[in-house]
Amino acid sequence: VSIYNLIVEDGTPFRAMQEAGTLALPAEDTQAAIDALTREMTERYGYQRYEVSNYAKPGYECRHNYGYWSGIPYLGFGLGAASCFRGERWSNLRSFPQYLALDMASELRQGCPTLHAEHETQSVQDQMEEFMFLGLSRTAGISEVEFKTRFQVDIHSVFGERLQRYTDEGLLIHEGYRYRFSERGMDVSNFILSDFLLD
C-alpha cells in the first residue's frame, strides 16, 4: 500500500483551484493526525512500513521499489522505459509512431541518440546525494560501510555534520554502522532529505 499526502504541483488544475481558493487542504496538524491514524490502521491489519510512504505485509514488499530505493542498477527496454546503469540515467522516447520508425540496428551502433529521449550523466556528488535520499527513504536506512565501499570515502567526511545534527535532534537513529529515521524523523523526512543535497 502506498500512501502519500497530496502535493500540489505548478501547472495543474489543483494549483489553479488552490490559487482561486476553491481547494481546501488539511492543515499541518490535521495531516499529522491522518499520518498517525494511517500508521495505526496499517499496523492493526499486519502491514509494516518499509519505506517513507509504503506499507506491506512481511514478505510482500514491492521488489521493484526495493531495487529502486536501494540504488540497484536497472535496464528498461521498450517505449518510455527508464534505465540507470553505471552513473548514467536515461529514458526511451514515449511516442509510439516515432519508436516504430526507428532503425534499431543503427540506433544501437550509434549509442541510441534518438531512442534515448532523456539522458543524464550523474556526477559522484549526484550519486552520493541519491544514495542518501533513496537510502534514508527506506525504514532500514543507510549503511556507512556500503557508502564507503561505493564511493571510497567515509560518509562522515561528506555528511557528518548533517548526520550528527539530526541524530542529536532525535530525527535519525544511529545503530552500529547504520542510520535510519526515527518515527518522528519519518514525519518530517522531506525536510531532512532536502538537506542532504550538497549544493
Per-range role (PLM):
Residues Q152-T167:
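Short amphipathic alpha-helical interaction segments
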Residues R178-S182:
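Minor-groove-contacting beta-hairpin "wing" of winged helix-turn-helix DNA-binding domains
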Residues R184-D199:
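Short, amphipathic alpha-helical interaction segments positioned at domain boundaries
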Residues T167-Y177:
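A short, conserved structural fragment
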